[in-house]
Design a protein with these regions (language model features):
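Extreme N-terminus nucleophile/cap motif
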Residues: 1-64, 181-189, 220-226
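Conserved beta strand-loop-helix elements of the APE1-like EEP
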Residues: 15, 82-85, 174-176, 211
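Short Pro/Gly-enriched beta-strand edge/turn motifs at strand-loop
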Residues: 28-33, 91, 153-155
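Short acidic (Asp/Glu) patches
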Residues: 33, 61-76, 85-107
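Domain-scale activation on soluble regions of proteins
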Residues: 37-45, 50-64, 68, 78, ...
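Short histidine
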Residues: 118-175, 179
Length: 227
């Protein structure tokens, strides 16, 4: 069995509250240009979460391509923490399902994923209809007992044990204090490598570079924690 989610995502931590409109336009342009290794577009919906002043995650999701909904970008609120995701569905039956669009969130955490896992086999059922939901279930279990950094490393070990091959595994996480990323791949590094931008006031984890920002690669096999 394969767990596949060929997607693009960004996670933002800002020193001050910012409006997401400008960065969403850049993200939408990047997602529109991007192609997965098998040629798919990230056109099967998108979502955005932002942390409100009362420390609760707000969310907007759509089954339309993100670049077709630029007229909505001005409607979202300012925030210091923003998470966005543009999706390429695994199968035709998986398209047009709003609940399958990320980000996923629970409690303090917002989560995004992209990657391809081959030969996935666990001894017990895992909650979730699709691969990204199941990975989120596994990560939540770890987050209930360990720090975000340790949870991401433990999740990687768990997937290594229960997958024949991990072609790509990219996870982004935000807890309303810091942002985190884990990145690994066995092929197609130009697609799977995450990027990181850091300035004195803004930090961005992104699937690909955004126009107007300087990025460096995220180290493979390590957790990036941006305080």
């Amino acid at each position: 069995m394969r767990r596949r989610d060929m997607c693009r995502f960004i996670i933002i931590k800002s020193q001050n509250e910012i409006h997401p409109e400008d960065i969403l336009h850049r993200f939408a342009a990047m997602a529109r240009r991007s192609r997965s290794p098998d040629g798919d577009r990230q056109s099967d919906g998108w979502g955005i979460s932002w942390l409100s002043n009362d420390m609760k995650w707000q969310v907007h999701k759509s089954i339309n391509p993100i670049w077709d909904e630029s007229h909505t970008f001005s409607s979202f609120s300012k925030s210091r923490f923003i998470v966005a995701h543009a999706r390429s569905a695994f199968s035709k039956n998986d398209k047009k399902v709003l609940a399958h669009n990320q980000p996923f969130y629970r409690g303090a955490y917002a989560f995004v994923f992209n990657g391809l896992l081959r030969g996935v086999s666990f001894s017990s059922p895992i909650a979730g209809d699709i691969g990204s939901q199941k990975i989120w279930t596994l990560l939540q279990d770890q987050l209930g007992r360990f720090s975000p950094n340790d949870s991401l490393l433990r999740l990687n070990k768990m997937l290594e044990k229960n997958c024949r091959e991990i072609e790509g595994l990219n996870i982004g996480l935000c807890d309303g204090i810091n942002i985190y990323a884990y990145c690994r791949n066995s092929m197609h590094p130009e697609y799977y490598n995450l990027r990181f931008h850091e300035s004195s006031t803004l930090k961005i984890i992104s699937s690909e570079a955004l126009d107007g920002y300087d990025f460096v690669p995220v180290e493979i096999g390590q957790v990036l924690t941006s305080y």
